[in-house]
C-alpha cells in the first residue's frame, strides 16, 4: 500500500535483526533516495554488515548499529524484520517497540517462514525442514533470551497476529507469500 512509492521518494528505514546486512544493502541499492539503518544485537555481525555496505557502495545512505529489537533508537517510515521475529525471546516486546518507533503513517514489514496455523498442514517437505531447523536453532535461541516465548520457525499467521496486535498494532494483512515465506504488513 504505497510503500514502494515512499521508498522511491525517500524515507527512513530500520532493518531490525539485519545480521550481516544483506537485506539492508539490497534495499539501499534498490532505493538510493531512502536512508537505511540496520540494527542487530550481535556486534560481529554489524561489523560484517558495515564492510558489506562499503563494498556495495551504499555507505552514503546506509549505516549499521548494534541494538536490540526492543531498544533501537529513532523513528521510521518503514521497519523491516526479515526472518527474525520468531527467533526473539520477547517478540511482543519487539512489536511494542516497533509500534512506538513508527511515524504515524508508517509500516512494519514482517517476513517470516511460511506456515499454516495447524501442525498437520505443515507436515510437508518444506515444513519439515523448518521444524528441524527450528528445533536446533530458532527455539533454543528464543528460550535463551528474556521471556523465551519460543515461537519457532513455524508459528503460523494466527500466532504472529497475536504477537503483532499484542504490540499495539490495529491492522495486519498478508501482503505476499511463497512456498518458503510469508510477508505481513502491520500498521498502527
Regions found by a protein language model. Give the residues of each.
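Core SAM-dependent methyltransferase catalytic element
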Residues: 168-188
Amino acid at each position: 500500500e504505497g510503500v514502494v512509492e515512499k521508498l522511491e521518494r525517500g524515507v527512513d528505514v530500520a532493518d531490525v535483526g539485519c545480521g550481516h546486512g544483506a537485506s539492508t544493502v539490497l534495499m539501499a541499492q534498490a532505493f538510493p533516495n531512502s536512508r537505511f539503518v540496520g540494527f542487530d544485537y550481535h556486534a560481529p555481525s554489524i561489523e560484517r554488515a558495515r564492510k558489506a555496505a562499503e563494498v556495495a557502495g551504499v555507505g552514503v545512505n546506509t549505516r549499521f548499529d548494534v541494538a536490540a529489537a526492543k531498544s533501537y533508537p529513532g523513528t521510521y517510515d518503514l521497519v523491516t524484520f526479515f526472518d527474525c521475529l520468531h527467533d526473539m525471546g520477547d517478540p511482543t516486546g519487539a512489536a511494542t517497540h516497533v509500534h512506538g518507533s513508527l511515524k504515524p503513517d508508517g509500516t512494519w514489514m514482517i517476513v517470516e517462514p511460511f506456515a499454516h496455523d495447524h501442525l498437520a498442514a505443515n507436515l510437508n517437505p518444506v515444513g519439515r525442514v523448518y521444524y528441524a531447523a527450528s528445533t536446533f536453532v530458532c527455539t533454543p535461541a528464543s528460550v535463551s533470551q528474556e521471556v523465551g516465548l519460543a515461537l519457532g520457525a513455524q508459528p503460523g499467521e494466527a500466532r504472529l497476529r497475536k504477537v503483532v496486535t499484542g504490540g499495539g498494532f490495529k491492522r495486519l494483512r498478508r501482503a505476499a507469500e511463497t512456498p518458503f515465506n510469508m510477508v505481513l504488513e502491520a500498521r498502527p
